[in-house]
């Protein structure tokens, strides 16, 4: 994410602190297309797979994304609940509990590194709420 400076910062607007609770991420559903999209985002990160990009691109797009999403979708379906992905459901519950303990000037949000809620959008939301300090967990 690129730094975006404030052209006209309003010092009269009360500053807030943001608490960003982060987790790795999860597909939006256990459907094959959502699992494929999640795996592509996750496995395209050069910090996750550290081999030359050209070689990895072929392996990822030519092999892994053709076969793995279907197998992984079945595994995701086996742990999925009526509420959704366990990782997302429990992460949201943690955020709600932490939010309830915080004073009014502290914003608590959840972001996933891969998938949704997206890290960049969540950070921009905190910025829009005038959060000038950020605690990342």
Q: Which role does the model predict for each range below?
A:
Residues 1-137:
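Active-site-proximal alpha-helix that buttresses catalytic centers in soluble enzyme cores
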């Amino acid at each position: 994410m690129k730094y975006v400076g404030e052209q006209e910062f309003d010092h009269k607007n009360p500053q807030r602190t943001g608490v960003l609770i982060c987790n790795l991420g999860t597909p939006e559903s256990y459907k094959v297309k959502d699992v494929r999209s999640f795996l592509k985002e996750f496995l395209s990160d050069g910090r996750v797979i550290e081999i030359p990009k050209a070689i990895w691109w072929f392996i990822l797009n030519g092999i892994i994304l053709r076969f793995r999403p279907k197998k992984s979708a079945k595994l995701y379906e086996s742990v999925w609940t009526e509420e959704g992905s366990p990782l997302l459901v429990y992460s949201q519950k943690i955020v709600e509990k932490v939010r309830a303990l915080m004073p009014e000037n502290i914003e608590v949000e959840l972001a996933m590194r891969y998938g949704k809620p997206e890290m960049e959008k969540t950070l921009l939301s905190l910025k829009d709420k005038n959060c000038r300090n950020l605690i990342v967990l």
